[in-house]
Amino acid sequence: MRLSYLSLALAIIFVLTIMHASNVEAKASADPEPDAVGSINVKNLMNMIREQITSRLKK
């Protein structure tokens, strides 16, 4: 009999916790890069890396 009271109490606590939880919103902290790509192949990735390295070495 006490086990059913325990499970009922846990269920009530669980429901109250969900009901009184604060709402959370996720916000982007940075703007996306203009050349960002969703899917990229390896050749394009290597070319992008090579361009970044050579541009930094020229400075």
Curated annotation (Swiss-Prot):
InterPro entries: Pilosulin. Expressed by the venom gland. GO terms for cellular component: extracellular region. Pfam families: Pilosulin. Residues 1-21 form the signal peptide. Transmembrane segments: none annotated. It is found in: Secreted. Keywords: Antimicrobial, Secreted, Signal. Residues 22-38 form a propeptide. Belongs to the formicidae venom precursor-01 superfamily. May have antimicrobial properties, like most ant linear peptides. This is U-myrmeciitoxin(01)-Mg5b. The lineage of its organism: Eukaryota, Metazoa, Ecdysozoa, Arthropoda, Hexapoda.
